[in-house]
């Protein structure tokens, strides 16, 4: 029975790893860099969910270089219309503040539009 459980784990573990989407993660990192107006962002833990509707990415980050992944507590989340390119950004959140096209706050709505335009330029 133990061998069967171990075999099942080994077979299913690679599928869990493959569920991550490096392409979505890279796209979200582009949004982070554009949002903070920087070319370098240190990224800690990353989780991507291409199988969800909408597909998304959640990561810890630091705008300061030299920070270890365990010391990164700031979070950034991205949601996209699709898991394949062009992803088309549908929403992003910095900590507890979210930005989207349906946002009531005019500044957040404007900031979202800017990020979507910048991302669309890169993905064309």
Can you say where each PLM-predicted feature lies in the sequence?
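N-terminal signal peptide c-region/cleavage motif recognized by signal peptidases
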Residues: 12-16
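C-terminal partner/receptor-binding element of secreted or periplasmic proteins
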Residues: 93-124
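Short, cysteine-centered beta-strand-loop-beta hairpins and adjacent loop/turn segments enriched
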Residues: 37-38, 62-75
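Short, hydrophobic/aromatic-rich segments at coil-to-beta transitions
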Residues: 52-62
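Short, non-transmembrane alpha-helical segments in secretory-pathway proteins
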Residues: 20-44
């Amino acid at each position: 029975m133990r061998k069967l459980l171990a075999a099942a784990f080994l077979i299913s573990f690679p599928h869990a790893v493959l569920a991550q989407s490096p392409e979505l993660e890279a796209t979200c990192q582009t949004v982070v860099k554009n949002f903070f107006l920087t070319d370098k962002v240190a990224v800690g833990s990353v989780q991507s969910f291409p199988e969800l509707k909408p597909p998304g990415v959640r990561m810890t980050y630091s705008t300061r270089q030299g920070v270890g992944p365990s010391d990164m507590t700031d979070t950034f989340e991205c949601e996209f219309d699709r898991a394949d390119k062009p992803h088309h950004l549908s929403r992003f959140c910095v900590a507890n503040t979210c930005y989207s096209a349906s946002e009531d706050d005019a500044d957040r709505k404007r900031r979202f539009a800017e990020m979507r335009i910048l991302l669309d330029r890169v993905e064309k």
